Amino acid sequence: AAFALSGTLDEEYARLSWMYGVKPATLHLLAMRHAYFGTELAAQALEFGKGEAKRLGYDSLRMDTCREDERMLALFKGQMTREAGSITFEDNALAYACFEAPLSEHCPMLPIRMHPAYRFGEMTPWGGEQLRSVYHKQIPDERTGEALEISAIPKLESVSDAGETLGELIAKNGARLTGKGAEDEFPLLLKLLAAREPLSVQVHPGDAYAKEHEHKLGKTEAWVILNAEPGASILYGMKEGVTLDGLREALKSGEDIEPMIERVNVQNGDVFYMPSGMVHAIGAGILLYEIQQSSDVTYRLWDYNRRNAAGELRPLHITQSLDVIDLGLHGARARMPEVGGNELVNLLRVPAFGLDCACVNGELELEANAGGFRMVTALAGLLLSWQG
């Protein structure tokens, strides 16, 4: 058997989203005499090639094989970590499958571009088409309320360029991807939310209540207002003097409880923190970025008597809401900074997550997040680049 190792990557490889290594090697032309087919020699040669690449200082191995070669496809699928996609060469019309593998447990991972799952239609009757008009997303419905950009929520998982769900990526890579706590449930959910109409007045439970009653994480969240129409506002915490008994009576009688809640006008760049237990609602005409715990537990207190296509009211969760509401919570606010120099500005740091704004006037280098992971969102005018 024979093969060639090289530290030079074919230009065709640049079209793919690779996942491992900042110093990759390429294995070319793995060949063997026909008499040795079926003897496991090719598998041994591939393992030997990995060892040689590691000995020469490379941290990952990449290779390709013709999609019509079923024998080599089976070998690479069995012994390489992942399939990165397909390429073609100018002098050859055939398609080639590309594979890669890290060469040690310390091999760094490259950024993984994720594609969202959507909540739309009757799931988000308040949704609109702003995700398409502002961010050119291929939304599935004119009432699309949420693009779940990084999500491990069952049946609403985001996927990589290669079609791998976030859950599959975590199962395959563990701590290499998520850092400490890789064996635990993925803790965060990142989404873009577009509200054509007001969302329901709602509250989310903390971890203890959610675990006991829903068998899920609680929900603490933060918003960054990306696009607000003139006069847009949110409901943000209960007014002073409101009592739990008074709120209970209003809810049981079907009274509109908006007058009991603080209303805040919003502008592009406003940042709002909502701890679990704080009553809130997003108003009409708002497009926002949301970072939250990975939970879909929402208790609706009031939904404006909104009905679906069948004429049915959406269910309210009065008992659960009253169990978890903390009338004294008023959140925290911040503003996105004006871009001056190149710096990473902290907007919020709470036990569940941190929220930073990368101010870039030219170029900004982000250090590795040792022991954890980062979710990076380029909202406008930024190019993310990395070695490897």
Residue ranges: model-predicted function:
Residues 53-65:
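Conserved GNAT acetyl-CoA-binding A-motif
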Residues 201-204, 266-284, 293, 388:
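Conserved metal-binding segment of the jelly-roll/cupin
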Residues 2-29, 33-37:
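Conserved acyl-donor/pantetheine-binding loop and adjacent beta-alpha core of acyl/acetyltransferases
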Residues 10, 64-65, 77-96:
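Conserved catalytic-core motifs of GNAT/GCN5-like acyltransferases
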Residues 299-373:
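C-terminal amphipathic alpha-helical segment
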Residues 32, 38-51, 55, 74, ...:
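Conserved acetyl-CoA-binding loop-helix of GNAT-fold acetyltransferases
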Residues 104-242, 303-330, 355:
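Transition-metal
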Residues 231-267, 368-388:
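A short beta-strand-loop-beta hairpin characteristic of the jelly-roll/cupin
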